[in-house]
Regions:
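Conserved glycine-rich Rossmann-like NAD(P)H-binding loop of the short-chain dehydrogenase/reductase
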Residues: 24-39
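Hydrophobic structural elements of the Rossmann-like NAD(P)H-binding subdomain
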Residues: 81, 122-124, 194-197, 207, ...
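Catalytic loop of short-chain dehydrogenase/reductase
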Residues: 85-90, 117-190, 201-204
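C-terminal helical subdomain
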Residues: 106, 161, 169, 174-177, ...
Length: 274
């Protein structure tokens, strides 16, 4: 049977990581919009990768479970790259929580049941999760360990507690990192690893939406004043992804890798400090 790499959200970052880790393996690309998924599959296929596609709505357990069944029919799932999501300028708080928080919890739960020994997963979180103030120990535990289907019922995630789309995004991305830390224990019992990457401003179509949206001036200021003095590229995220999914990352699991050009540092100790 083939070794299968599942890529959920086959945009710039998902494709870049897949290129680094999928040679000689079967790539299953999954996304909400079939036309985008097929376009990404054509690019990878023309580059020599063995590719198939599927449609998935990560906010639906039934849809994610169907994707798991498709993947396991192809072979042993040795890698999961979850890069699907929506940004603050693209969706309401309710949609962001459903896709970015609940959706990631579903992917972790469902693929955690089938990941092959020696396998690895990378979930794309965000620097925004590091921009959220400290939560209580009880809130951390709720985000990390509440069963996925009960997660959106938590008091801290109700409409009267979530201020706006940015706040929903920050909570979701903080939750992603906490969730992966907890899920690493369960994945480890199968001999597998899982980590998050929290990128800063990476030049993807999603970032362009933010840069041209209502908060664009603030995003440009963040790029200018972060220590790196620039945004990042999907290939740079893929470098970290390849480490986490490969043998050199064999002792790394349950971790969150912040790669933001020093943006968080600038907010805490530099010119972006409040």
């Amino acid at each position: 049977m083939s070794n299968v790499i599942v890529v959920i959200g086959p945009g710039s970052i998902g494709q870049a990581i897949a290129r680094r880790v999928s040679a000689g393996k079967h790539v299953l690309l999954a996304g909400l919009r079939q036309e985008n998924t097929e376009a990404a599959a054509e690019v990878l296929s023309n580059a020599g990768f063995e590719v198939s596609t599927a449609t998935v709505d990560v906010s639906s357990r039934e849809s994610v479970h169907a994707l798991v069944q498709t993947a396991t029919a192809l072979g042993d799932v040795t890698g999961v790259i979850h890069a699907a999501g929506v940004s603050p300028s693209q969706a309401s708080p309710e949609t962001i929580l459903s896709v970015d928080l609940y959706g990631t919890a579903l992917v972790l739960e469902e693929f955690g049941n089938v990941i092959a020994p020696g396998g690895a997963g990378v979930m794309i979180a965000s620097q925004s999760g590091h921009g959220l103030g400290a939560l209580t120990a009880e809130e951390d535990a709720a985000l990390a360990m509440t069963p996925a289907d009960e997660l959106l019922g938590q008091p801290m995630l109700q409409p009267d507690q979530v201020r706006d789309s940015l706040h929903a995004y920050q909570l979701s991305k903080r939750g992603n990192a906490l969730r992966v830390m907890a899920e690493a224990v369960r994945w480890g019992k199968r001999g597998a690893r899982v980590n998050t990457i929290s990128p800063g401003i990476i030049f993807t179509p999603m970032a362009k939406d933010e840069l041209t949206g209502p908060g664009g001036e603030g995003y440009r200021r963040m790029i200018e004043l972060c220590p790196a003095g620039r945004g990042g590229t999907p290939d740079e995220v893929a470098t970290v992804g390849a480490l986490l999914m490969g043998p050199d990352g064999g002792f790394i699991t349950g971790s969150d890798f912040l790669m933001d050009g020093g943006l968080t540092a600038a907010y805490r100790f530099g010119e972006l400090a409040p």
